[in-house]
Amino acid sequence: PSYRDVIQLRAMDFTTTAVDAPALTGVRVPGEQLGGAEAFRRWVGSEVIPFLRDQYRVSEMTFVGHSFSALFGVHVLFESPSMFDHYLLASPSVWWDDQVMFRREQERYDSGQGLKAHVFMSKGELETDELSPHQDFHDQLASRNYEGLNLHWQVFPKETHLSVAPVALSHGLRTLHSTR
């Protein structure tokens, strides 16, 4: 597949709503090719996880995502938090669709639902909050005091949106799996 194909498939599976995507990656993706996160979540839950549990000895499941895939992780966290035991969300694209995930979190909170999950969120120091307000999203989650939510936050010095991924992966996995 071409670079364009990969970007389009990634955007389809990881975005939560079907709105026109800005050409941040150099590839413009029309809205009708977006918003497949819920279908992708159902497929992961009904096909991928059962396959993994059938084929391998799995005791814990950790979701790892960066950027759009971390946006998908936030969606899974709100829709079915018990799908994974741990969530590593590096630079989630919470800017998506005029910050729709802020509203989804507010709806979850207003409904009185809990949020039992172990979450590591992070961003690179050199990422601008205008593009993705990671700190604000973390602060909104942290302010709720959800029973059972174990939330970690890390800003990595001198890291950009792209360079933060490997650092967040290493640090996040150690953080999530050292608190058992």
Predicted features along the sequence, with ranges:
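Non-catalytic cap/lid and distal C-terminal segments of serine-dependent acyl enzymes
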Residues: 1-180
